[in-house]
Amino acid sequence: MPIPDMSSQYPHQQEDMSQEEEPRGRKPQSMVDQEKQDYLDFIVPRLQITGKILQLTEEVIQEQANYISRYIDFLNKYINYQRKVSTLRFERATLIKYVKKLRFLNDFLYTYNADVNMITEPLQKLVRPLGSFFIRYLEIIDLLNYYLTQSLRNETISKTLNQDLVLSQECIAMADKTYRVYVKFVQWFIESSSSVTTGDLTMEIVQFTRKCAVEDGIDLGETDDVLLQEVQLVTSSEEFEDLLEKWQQVLHFQCADLDDTFNDNIRHWSELFDKKKEK
């Protein structure tokens, strides 16, 4: 099945910015502050954990675990091929360290069980600890992606004098796309039910992307960059349920695409070393 049209499923997109009279489609700060306070006073107290939210959250957590597992499987196979090249022993040791870290984080996701006693509790009681953990593992994925596509790539080419044992451009692009999709989900998961995000619930990549966009004079109301699109606040537990279910589907299909691309790269390496054996 194809990945759903995700642009229509991001719950934070501002639908019609053309009606705003303020420059760059922004409301006066005083109005924004009042809207946030009204949301905290009147909407947040009504956002409660439901049985369906717990069920969907477990399904979404499984998608996070699947995402990490795709990397673990891919890295293990990559490491096996690196063993065939003695000059890459230090790079191989670094990847092994990443695998151990990802396995440790994944253990939490695989053993997570939603507490049914949380039903009717405030939604933030579920969102905040999970959101913080999601950010934690995504920061590791971010560092890993940089290592795979920059440092490791350059060192491998330098030491082997060819590009046979590096990630393909298609693989790099898919890894980046998938990472951004998962980041956007976590941003939505955290921000859709609270107008205040601080401390361990802030996402570096989102803040950095916004900062660069502002410095470059990009209209945040018109951009196609998913990380710059605003998160719309939900107004009921039922709305949160509906959007969470859609996100689960988006994550599922995106992770499947990543798995296919990783496998394509592995097949390329397999064919490469099989040919060398024949010689």
Curated annotation (Swiss-Prot):
Compositional bias (Polar residues) at which positions?
A: 1-12
Any one Gene Ontology BP term = mRNA transport
- The segment annotated Disordered runs over 1-31
- Please indicate which superkingdom the organism of origin belongs to: Eukaryota
Q: Which GO terms describe its cellular component?
A: cellular bud tip; cytoplasm; nucleus
Q: Which GO terms describe its molecular function?
A: lipid binding; sequence-specific mRNA binding
User: Is the keyword Nucleus assigned to this protein?
Assistant: yes
Q: Which UniProt keywords apply?
A: Cytoplasm, mRNA transport, Nucleus, RNA-binding, Transport
InterPro entries recorded: RNA-bd_She2, She2_dom_sf
Q: Where in the cell is it found?
A: Cytoplasm; Nucleus
Does Nucleus show up as a keyword for this record? Answer: yes
Q: What is its main location?
A: cytoplasm
Disulphide-bridged cysteine pairs: none
Task of the protein: RNA-binding protein that binds specific mRNAs including the ASH1 mRNA, coding for a repressor of the HO endonuclease. Part of the mRNA localization machinery that restricts accumulation of certain proteins to the bud and in the daughter cell.
Assembly and interaction partners: Homodimer and homotetramer.
In the record, the note on similarity to other proteins reads: Belongs to the SHE2 family.
Mind telling me what this protein is named? SWI5-dependent HO expression protein 2
> What is the protein's species of origin?
Eremothecium gossypii (strain ATCC 10895 / CBS 109.51 / FGSC 9923 / NRRL Y-1056)
Q: Which gene encodes it?
A: SHE2
